[in-house]
Amino acid sequence: MKNFYPIKSKKELEMFIKTDRIACFGSDKISFEKKLRNPFKTNLFNFLKLLRKYEYLCFKRDSSKNAIKSKLTSFQIKLIDIKKNNLSLKLDIEINPFHCGKGVRICHPNVIINGYTGDNCIFHGNNVIGNKKTGAKTDIPKIGNNVDIGTGAIIIGDIVIADNCVIGAGAVVTKSFTTPGTVIAGVPAKEISGEK
């Protein structure tokens, strides 16, 4: 499966980073004091910034026709990957590159995202978004924009979650919900309400 490159220019990189900063801190301008008072958010934003740079540099390397520039970019990617992975361990968060839309908001640690998520998704913590036991890269969830995923919610398998859905705390989602604005809860998850 080929990589999907969401960030193809420096301008797009800056836009992704700005949107992630606003999602983390509620503002594009962050004071030094605010960073000190919120170490989790500060480290999370630094992780997301490294993730976005990694995604951009992968596109730059793979689209380069110059072998020397490509090798230099590969070296940059390795350095960023090491920093990103160290922060990932510190935060207890795992997000696969090229899988997460801009403006992601993670409220608490223990989040694994191995599925495609749209823009402005909220993860409240202790969430797993992943594939079934087959391990195939195609058996992963596709989550729309503006989806709010409650604490402890798990989304597994080759399923689709529509835009603007809310997934309740502790829900185990193993089937698709394609109606936008659906409230989903339970084990196994079922529709509680939808947009009217």
Model-derived segments and spans:
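Left-handed beta-helix
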Residues: L91, N96-P97, G101-G103, C107-H108, ...
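Residues at secondary-structure transition points
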Residues: L44, K137-T138
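Terminal amphipathic alpha-helical/low-complexity segments used for targeting or macromolecular assembly
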Residues: M1-L89
